[in-house]
Each structure stands twice: as structure tokens, then as C-alpha cells.
């Protein structure tokens, strides 16, 4: 690394310090006002910003610019335009206008719209999000933007997120003003995204069609060793992986992404990266860049980065923990309980709002993480169950119980930890333990939403959280508005008691992996939406439509479009997996099996010719076993082909998605098990693809 980290950090970002240095004072102030308060950006300001941004980009080797946006595909999109502008006399100049900065016009017809746009209705618009800084990637200036249709409907992940940020800020600020904090002008959602991923050798990756097409293995007998020794988690990082991590950090730091923590995860070949908290729209943008850079840097190290939620059967899959908090523009974390949480009225109000929101909109939180990949992970004793519950920890649950019962809470105070040997330091014990089985856990000064899958855009979960909490806060403001003094105190006390009493069912501090909890959750009336097709219809329930439209986050039409897009994506994902399985079995695995059986038969015949009367029992036993498995695989493959044909004839995506989940996935599992049984009997040099041994342990 030629530069120090402070010199490197943000060097490819047109950030606040660059703007301050390059823009005239009046222009900088106008832009800062837009960024901080959301005021309208005048064209003359945009023109000045565009000129400064272009000059900065050219100095860093950029030749093109792009409006970088996040359509409903869940990944980013970009179209590159050069700064070049011919003069008409055989020469060219480099130009970039305020209009080009503020607005773009990509073709909207080729992106998912869920029926909002017909194919012939091609015009769409991208609009600059000045709260997320422009950056340089390669030779291209990337300008973060929102994406909408010609008629103004949101066609992306960013627009509803920005709307939800405004909604929760409005209601949280209102509540703080009621409490007397009138200096607060804005409340920001902050997020830290813990990104899990796998690294495998690139050559092994290229030999697996399932990894290429499906991002997960469709077959694979378990390696002799998995994760049962607990020796990979936080273990020593292998040199090849360490080199990848070092370069990844450098690339992320250049882009102003505050990558902080890196370590081995539980499963072999699994790792994690975690950044410092940022404002949610910036955190979501940065997480998209993190995933992109992971793949690019891995490729340069002859590795492949797998972001699927369950790339390997029999070991842990990958998630993306969404650490969520609320902070004021004056620098206060509203989820910080302080030293005496029982006496912290402000904290208790915001805690109650989150508890109510999670209970009332648990179905939406489940939907926000519903994908074909994540269905393999949730509820599998490696990730939270599909039932949404909320963990508070021992002390906070006791505080809540005291409010409900109106019994004075006597805190234990700070507890000093002493491990034993005098040489080891004493330190203060945290108020809450960590519950890794909880979908939604309070972890000291934030909530950790643990259900999102590793490949997911975090826009969806945070849109739900922001909007649901905004609804709770709006209800609180309605009750408390206009009250002062003792009247306000009494109203707050009653509000807290009623809220914690009415929503007590969502609070659970125990082991979420047990069958006993699932039975208890059912008794409490908590939804258990086990699969994506089961969950998605709840998105368009009347109460949820009302929530989004009331807070101007999504229109009814935009909500229905997302319902259609998510269903279609689910069905198409399983369809691709089924077709890939069909091809791998038909063209690759069965021919390899037949080749080995043929060689076994030849070996047996040769032995008998060379040594008359010699036994060939071992060969015959293996041939019989493999031939039986081949028949099973072939028969089941015929069944799968018929099922695929049936699904292809369905024009209702909910019906198709349900069929893929209930019928086709079950048949694919039958084939997987038969192939795995055969795989362990066949030498590796006959197999058409690398085994789990090579994929997980040969880096």
C-alpha cells in the first residue's frame, strides 16, 4: 500500500471536503442545504457542481460518467457516456452539464416493472441523489441516482428507501419536539451491514455449472470434515484469503467505504466483512459496492466469491445482519438506553415504537428477506427461524415488565467482570447478552435484524423498518401532541404501559431454534411464513397497502408491481436451478457414472481372464449399487422434466411459485440425494465437477 490509510480513504470520492475546496462558497452552501434539508437544487447550482465534479474526475483519469442506480433486479445498473464532445473542426472538448448531472434517461422497458410499464413504454428517468457522494470506478464517474418511469412510478430500490427515511425522520422529529428537543431538525436511520461470503478456487468454480448458473451447488456429498470442530470461526486467515482481504480493503477505502472488521466465519471457506455505521441510503449504496468489489477482487486472486445464501448443503449458509439505529442531526443515538434505561423516557418511547412496529408488521419484515436462496437458510439451526420475534435481553425485559406491572424497577447497576487471574483486566459487563437465534435483537444501542440473506439489497428491509416505525411514532405523536408537564408525563406512562402490554407477544429472549418456541409462537399468534410463496401475498394485504400509502413510501400500484416482480423472480430462480440440474445430470453426471461402471466391468472381466476362478465380488457389488442408483436418478430425472414442463405452462406466478416450492424443489432434493450417494462411490478423476473437499478446503 503506497499511501497511508487516511490518504487512501475516500480518494476516489467527490466528498464534502472536495466540494468545499472546489466549489464557490455560495454554491457549496446551496448544495449543503439540499443535502442536509432536502431543499430544491437550482440548475445554476447543478451546473457549477457538474463542472467541478468533471474536473475532479478528469484529474483521476475518468473518461466517462454514468447514472448509477439500483433497479428491481437487486443489483446495480449503469450506462456509460463519455465526457467527449466534438467541436466540429476535428477536435473535441470534455463537457458535463448540470442537466446531465441531475437527470438521465435510460430505457425503462428492459428492467423489471411488475406491470407498471409496457415494453413499448421505454422512457425512464434517473435523478441524482446528492446525499450519496459520486465516486470513480475504473475510468467512470458514478453518480448515485434514483430510477423512475416516465409517469413517475418508482422502478428501483433507492426511491422508496429515501421516502421511508423522510417518513421516519418526520415522525421521530415530531416526537422529540413534543419532548422538548426543538433543536432537532432531522432524524437519520443509520445502518451497519455485516456481509458474509464464501471464497472458492476459480478453476473449481468454472467446472461447476450449478455455481455458474445458480450460484449454489445442486449436488455434493459432504466432505469428511465440515464445521463440527468449530475451528474455522475466528481462526487464522489463510495467506491467499488474507491477500484478497488486503486488496479488498484498499479498494473499499478508496471508495470511502469504512470497512472495519474481517474474520473467518463458522463454515469452511466462509468469511465476513463489517463496516462502520452510515446513514442508511449510503450504507445500502456501499453494500452494493462491497458485493461488486468482492467479486472483482476475488477474480484477480484466482478466486470466486459466492454470495448465495446457501451455496453448500450441510454447512452454514451466509447472511447479512442489518444493524439499525436512529440518530438525530445533533448527534444523539435515540436507541442508547443510557446508564438507567428505566428512567430514560425518550429511549423507552423509541423502544416501544420499535416493539409495536415489529409486532404489527412482522409479516412485512419476513417478506423483506423472502428469496429462493434465503428460504434454504431460515429456520435451519444456522439462522433465525421464519417466525419474527424480538430479543431485548434480561435487563430491558425486566424494565418492560416493571412498566407493565407498575412495579418499581431496581437496576443492578454496572457489574464488573473478573475472569480470575490478576494479570487480566477487569471490565464492565454489558447489560444484554447476544442471542444469535433471534431474528430481531437489541444489542446495546441498536437493533440487529439477522434474517436478511447475503445477496440481498438491504433497501427492502430498511424500507419496512423505517415505515413501520414511522407509523408507530405517528400514533404516539397523536396521543401526546399538545400535552405538557404532568399531563404529558402521565400520558407517556400510560402509552408505554399499553404498548408493551399489547405487544408483549413479540418479545422472546429464549432459543429460537427449538420446536418448543415454534409451538409457543403459534400459541401467541405470531405468523410463521415458511417460504417465499407463502409470505409474498401478505405484501398486498390491506393493512400493508394502507401503511405504505399513508406515509407516501409506495403507492398501491408500486406495491403490486413489487409483489409481481418478487413472485416472478422466485419462480424463475427455481426454474433455472431445475433446468441446470437436468443438464448436469443428463450430460455430465450419468455419463461419468456409466464410464466408471464400464471400466469396473472391464476390470472384472480382465481379472477373470488373467486368473480363472478369481472372485470379482467387490466389482460386482459396486456395479450393482451404481447401476441401481443410475436407474433411480434416470427415473427421477424423467419425473423432474415432466414437472418443469407443467410449471412452464403456468401463467400465474403465485401458482407457479407454489408449485416450484412444494413439488419441484422436493423432487430436486430426491435427485440430489441419489447423486450424492453415487458420488461417494466414484473416483474423483471420473467425476465431471470438483467435490466439496476441493471447493471448501483447497485454498
Model-derived regions, located:
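N-terminal flexible segment immediately upstream of the FAD-binding catalytic core
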Residues: 1-26, 140-141, 264-273
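Gly-rich Lys/Arg/Thr-decorated short loops/hinges at beta-loop-alpha junctions or inter-strand turns
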Residues: 2-15, 34-36, 224-233
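Active-site core of metal-dependent hydrolases
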Residues: 9-120
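Active-site proximal loops enriched in glycine and acidic residues that flank catalytic Cys/His/Asp
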Residues: 45, 69, 97, 275, ...
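Active-site-proximal loop/turn and secondary-structure-junction residues that shape catalytic pockets
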Residues: 45-49, 69-71, 99-100, 147, ...
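Short linear, low-complexity motifs centered on an aromatic residue
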Residues: 74-89, 109, 208-210, 215-217, ...
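Glycine-rich, acidic/polar active-site loops that bind/position phosphate-bearing ligands
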Residues: 121-307, 316-319, 326-564
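C-terminal amphipathic alpha-helical interaction region
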Residues: 501-699
Amino acid at each position: 500500500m503506497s499511501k497511508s490509510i487516511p490518504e487512501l480513504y475516500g480518494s476516489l470520492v467527490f466528498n464534502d471536503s472536495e466540494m468545499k475546496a472546489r466549489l464557490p462558497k455560495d454554491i457549496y452552501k446551496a448544495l449543503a442545504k439540499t443535502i442536509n434539508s432536502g431543499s430544491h437544487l437550482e440548475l445554476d447550482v447543478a451546473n457549477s457542481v457538474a463542472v467541478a465534479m468533471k474536473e475532479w474526475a478528469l484529474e483521476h483519469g475518468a473518461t466517462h460518467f454514468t447514472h448509477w442506480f439500483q433497479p428491481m433486479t437487486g443489483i446495480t445498473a449503469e450506462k456509460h457516456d463519455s465526457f467527449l464532445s466534438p467541436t466540429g473542426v476535428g477536435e473535441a472538448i470534455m463537457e458535463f452539464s448540470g442537466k446531465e448531472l441531475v437527470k438521465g434517461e435510460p430505457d425503462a422497458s428492459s428492467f423489471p416493472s411488475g406491470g407498471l410499464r409496457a415494453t413499448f413504454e421505454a422512457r425512464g428517468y434517473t435523478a441524482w441523489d446528492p446525499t450519496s457522494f459520486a465516486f470513480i470506478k475504473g475510468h467512470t464517474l458514478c453518480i448515485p441516482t434514483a430510477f423512475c418511469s416516465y409517469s413517475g412510478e418508482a422502478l428501483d430500490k433507492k426511491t422508496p428507501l429515501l421516502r421511508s427515511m423522510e417518513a421516519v425522520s418526520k415522525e421521530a422529529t415530531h416526537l422529540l419536539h413534543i419532548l422538548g428537543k426543538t433543536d432537532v431538525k432531522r432524524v437519520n436511520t443509520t445502518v451497519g451491514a455485516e456481509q458474509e461470503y464464501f471464497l472458492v478456487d476459480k478453476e473449481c468454480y468454472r467446472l461447476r455449472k450449478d455455481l455458474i448458473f445458480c450460484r449454489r451447488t445442486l449436488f455434493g456429498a459432504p466432505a469428511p470434515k465440515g464445521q463440527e470442530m468449530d475451528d474455522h470461526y475466528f481462526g487464522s486467515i489463510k495467506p491467499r484469503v488474507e491477500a484478497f482481504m488486503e486488496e479488498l480493503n484498499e479498494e473499499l477505502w478508496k471508495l470511502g467505504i469504512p470497512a472495519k472488521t474481517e474474520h473467518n466465519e463458522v463454515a469452511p471457506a466462509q468469511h465476513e466483512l463489517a463496516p462502520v455505521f452510515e446513514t442508511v441510503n449510503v450504507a445500502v449504496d456501499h453494500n452494493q459496492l462491497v458485493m461488486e468489489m468482492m467479486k472483482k477482487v476475488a477474480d484477480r486472486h484466482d478466486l470466486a466469491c459466492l454470495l448465495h445464501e446457501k451455496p453448500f448443503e450441510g454447512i452454514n449458509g451466509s447472511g447479512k445482519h442489518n444493524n439499525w439505529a436512529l440518530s438525530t442531526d445533533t448527534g444523539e443515538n435515540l436507541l442508547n438506553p443510557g446508564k438507567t434505561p428505566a428512567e430514560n423516557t425518550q429511549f423507552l418511547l423509541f423502544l416501544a415504537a420499535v416493539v409495536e412496529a415489529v409486532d404489527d408488521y412482522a409479516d412485512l419484515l419476513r417478506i423483506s428477506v423472502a428469496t429462493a436462496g434465503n428460504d434454504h437458510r431460515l429456520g435451519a439451526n444456522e439462522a433465525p427461524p421464519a417466525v419474527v420475534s424480538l430479543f431485548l435481553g434480561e435487563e430491558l425485559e425486566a424494565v418492560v415488565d416493571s412498566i407493565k406491572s407498575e412495579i418499581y424497577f431496581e437496576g443492578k447497576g454496572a457489574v464488573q467482570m473478573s475472569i480470575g487471574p490478576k494479570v487480566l483486566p477487569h471490565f464492565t459487563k454489558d447489560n444484554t447478552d447476544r442471542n444469535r437465534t433471534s431474528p430481531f435483537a437489541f444489542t446495546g444501542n441498536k437493533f440487529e435484524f439477522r434474517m436478511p440473506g447475503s445477496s440481498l439489497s438491504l433497501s427492502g428491509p430498511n424500507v419496512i423498518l423505517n415505515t413501520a416505525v414511522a407509523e408507530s411514532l405517528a400514533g404516539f405523536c397523536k396521543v401526546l401532541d399538545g400535552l405538557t408537564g404532568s399531563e404529558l408525563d402521565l400520558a407517556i406512562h400510560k402509552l408505554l404501559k399499553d404498548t408493551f402490554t399489547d405487544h408483549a407477544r413479540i418479545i422472546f429472549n429464549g432459543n429460537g431454534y427449538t420446536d418448543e418456541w415454534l409451538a409457543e409462537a403459534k400459541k401467541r399468534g405470531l405468523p410463521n411464513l415458511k417460504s417465499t410463496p407463502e409470505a409474498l401475498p401478505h405484501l398486498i394485504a390491506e393493512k400493508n397497502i394502507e401503511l405504505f400509502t399513508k406515509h407516501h413510501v409506495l403507492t398501491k400500484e408500486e406495491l403490486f408491481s413489487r409483489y409481481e416482480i418478487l413472485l416472478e423472480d422466485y419462480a424463475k430462480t427455481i426454474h433455472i436451478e431445475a433446468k441446470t440440474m437436468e443438464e448436469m445430470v443428463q450430460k455430465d453426471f450419468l455419463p461419468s457414472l456409466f464410464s466408471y461402471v464400464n471400466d469396473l466391468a472391464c476390470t472384472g472381466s480382465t481379472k477373470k481372464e488373467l486368473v480363472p476362478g478369481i472372485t470379482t465380488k467387490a466389482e460386482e457389488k459396486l456395479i450393482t449399487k451404481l447401476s441401481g442408483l443410475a436407474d433411480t436418478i434416470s427415473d427421477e430425472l424423467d419425473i423432474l422434466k415432466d414437472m418443469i414442463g407443467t410449471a412452464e405452462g403456468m401463467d400465474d406466478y403465485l401458482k407457479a411459485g407454489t408449485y416450484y416450492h412444494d413439488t419441484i424443489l422436493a423432487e430436486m432434493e430426491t435427485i440430489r440425494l441419489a447423486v450424492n450417494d453415487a458420488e461417494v462411490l466414484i473416483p474423483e478423476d471420473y467425476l465431471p465437477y470438483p467435490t466439496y473437499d476441493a471447493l471448501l478446503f483447497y485454498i
